[in-house]
Design a protein with these regions (language model features):
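ABC ATPase nucleotide-binding domain signature region
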Residues: 1
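Catalytic-site-adjacent helices and loops of nucleotide signaling machinery
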Residues: 21-22
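C-terminal catalytic/motor cores of large multi-domain enzyme assemblies
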Residues: 4, 8, 12-15, 27, ...
Length: 308
């Protein structure tokens, strides 16, 4: 690891000998350290069962619920799990060091809904669960291809912008153990059904606690769905998954009256979008242009599949 990475590891209390590097010639990167912390085993002082932190693909014992310390003052204390501690550190670092700007927008998606409805039964025969997320992953790839300045990160220590030639899209996955972001690697080379199958597989690993550091490192940007729950959201202000430079929040689909070609109001499904980006790398006008491209791809899935 380079000196800056070693200093970063020391500041996080991480032993570099426990990490397998994903950089050139096996070098350890900041992303490797962040991924290791996100999937770290609980410390011995915590009342939790051990989980693997190496590249082993074994199923860990279930993490037990921390026992609260009772108090007569109307308060209670609970130990944070190692995962929660790592997430808290990472999120705090982002909000205190990265100037994040969020753009809120919407897109009409009737063609996308119809396209998925036509394909979902066929997808099932090919062992693919076709939700809207694979479309959104491909739309992010197509957007990054048209806007290559979006596909990068900031290295403040070196005073450099680093741009990627790969298109790796993270998909935020909620589990009982916390939030994980497995990465769809080389998403530009995969079909809609391939991405659907991989999302299902990575989600299963996240819920089982068997994701590796390699599964969660090297992302170009992240997609997070706040509209897929019983109490689904509309817009949000998502925090970027550093060192990535952008994250796309997907809200619920809602029917709204929109004018047709003759100006007559017609009920159409509309998806809410929350696009957050690192303003050090991306200017506002470029971010809006990229978001407009993404909206076009979601509005026209035939164009999306032709471009990506």
């Amino acid at each position: 690891a380079v000196p800056g990475v070693r200093r970063y590891a020391r500041s996080k209390g991480v032993d570099l000998t426990c990490i397998t590097g994903s950089g050139n010639h096996g070098k350890i990167t900041r992303e490797d350290i962040d991924a290791y912390l996100a999937n770290a085993a609980p410390t011995p002082t915590q009342p939790t069962a051990p989980a693997p932190t190496s590249e082993e693909n074994t199923t860990p014992a279930a993490e037990s619920t921390p026992q609260p310390a009772t108090s007569s003052s109307g308060q209670r204390r609970e130990k944070m799990s190692a995962i929660r501690k790592a997430a808290a550190r990472a999120l705090t670092e982002v909000v205190t060091t990265v100037p994040v700007v969020t753009i809120l927008d919407r897109v009409e998606v009737s063609a996308l809904v119809a396209h998925r409805n036509r394909l979902k039964d066929t997808a099932a025969t090919r062992e693919a669960k076709l939700t809207y997320t694979p479309y959104i992953v491909k739309a992010c790839v197509a957007m990054l291809k048209k806007n290559p300045l979006m596909n990068g990160r900031v290295d403040m220590a070196a005073g450099e912008f680093i741009y990627y030639d790969t298109f790796n899209i993270g998909v935020a996955t909620n589990t009982d153990r916390g939030l994980f972001v497995p990465i769809i690697k080389d998403a530009d080379r995969k079909s809609l059904f391939d991405i659907a199958r991989e999302i299902t597989e990575l989600s299963s690993h996240a819920k089982a606690g068997t994701l590796t550091s390699a599964d969660m490192s090297g992302g170009s940007m992240t997609v997070t769905n706040v509209g897929g729950f019983a109490t689904s959201g509309v817009w949000s202000t998502p925090i970027i998954n550093a060192p990535e430079a952008a994250i796309l929040g997907i809200g619920r689909f809602e029917d709204e009256f929109l004018p047709d070609k003759k100006g007559k109001p017609v009920l159409r499904p509309v998806c809410k979008l929350s696009f957050a980006f690192d303003h050090r790398l991306i200017d506002g006008v470029d971010a809006q242009k990229a978001l407009n491209d993404l909206k076009e791809f979601l509005h026209n899935p035939d164009l999306l599949l032709a471009e990506s």
